[in-house]
Swiss-Prot record:
Protein name per Swiss-Prot or TrEMBL: Foldase protein PrsA 2
Lipidation (N-palmitoyl cysteine): 21
PpiC domain residues: 135-226
Gene name of the record: prsA2
Annotated localization: Cell membrane
Catalytic activity: [protein]-peptidylproline (omega=180) = [protein]-peptidylproline (omega=0)
Length: 293
């Protein structure tokens, strides 16, 4: 959850609240002068208005063409919750978000994702080319500890016959996975720390266990639970398509999709103060229009 995104969301919510209140009135009184609701609204509109109106507009445009269910949002929400483990509530609080406001942002992100996927070429020709270098997802468990000595201690216990799941519960500092034996969600290439990914994919058989692997998070011992199994294009096509679509969810492709959706929606900005809000999507600005007069 990047700070810039969170700050923008919080400011947009505040701007919406001010707009909903309407009317004048003071928000701050001093002997030197008062700060009115209108002054605060204008200041926030000037600083955050473009970002706010962009998201509201695209929510309307994309929501009319693509459907994101409550179940879709809840699934993504639970993924984040699992990723952050016991720290999730604290992260939301520190970010000035509630579960409701975070889910609102997730819904918008999923709308952009669905639109991008709908505008992506998934012909057999494209997918077969991608299949040449594609690797299936794998499922592994890991035990994460802070230092190498502790990792070697755990490694020795495994060699002595102790169960991986029991040691994960006892030693792992990954609170999101330790209680389920350290098992991670399935992942493919490019999804994990490079050193972790290399060590995981080097395990070829179920039950294989790695030596301690150092990453930015500490030291991992990895167990292969479900190795990669590549069969034929026809049998793997569904997984290949899902993987390819995910690989195409780049900032560049999403921006290209939003430009297309914006053009198709025949958008007209009526507020002169927000004329430049969509300049990145229509290639123009109010200053361009003024200079051409």
């Amino acid at each position: 959850m990047k700070k810039k995104l969170i700050l923008g969301l919080v400011m947009m919510m505040a701007l919406f609240s001010l707009a909903a209140c309407g009317g004048g009135g003071d928000v701050v009184k001093t002997d030197s002068g008062d700060v009115t609701k209108d002054e605060l609204y204008d200041a926030m509109k000037d600083k955050y208005g473009s970002e706010f109106v962009q998201q509201l507009t695209f929510e309307k445009i994309l929501g009319d063409k693509y459907k994101v269910s409550d179940e879709d949002v809840d699934k993504k929400f639970n993924e984040y919750k699992s990723q952050y483990g016991d720290q999730f509530s604290a992260v939301l609080t520190q970010s000035g978000l509630t579960e409701k406001s975070f889910k609102s942002q997730l819904k918008y992100n999923l709308l952009v994702q669905k639109a991008t996927e709908a505008n992506t070429d998934t012909s057999d020709k494209t997918l077969k080319k991608y299949y040449e270098t594609w690797q299936p997802d794998i499922t592994v468990s890991h035990i994460l500890v802070a230092d190498e000595n502790k990792a070697k201690e755990v490694e020795q216990k495994l060699k002595d016959g102790e169960k991986f799941a029991d040691l994960a519960k006892e030693y792992s500092t990954d609170t999101a996975t330790k209680d389920n034996g350290g098992q991670l969600a399935p992942f493919g290439p490019g999804k994990m720390d490079p050193a972790f990914e290399k060590a995981a994919y080097a395990l070829k058989n179920k039950g294989d266990i790695s030596a301690p692997v150092k990453t930015q998070y500490g030291y991992h011992i990895i167990q292969m639970d479900k190795p990669a199994t590549k069969t034929t294009f026809e049998k793997d096509k569904k997984a290949v398509k899902a993987s390819y679509l995910e690989s195409q969810l780049t900032t560049e492709n999403m921006q290209k999709t939003l430009k297309k959706e914006y053009k198709d929606a025949n958008v007209k900005v009526e507020d002169k103060d927000l004329k430049d809000a969509f300049k990145d999507f229509d290639g123009s600005s109010s200053s361009d229009s003024d200079s051409s007069k």
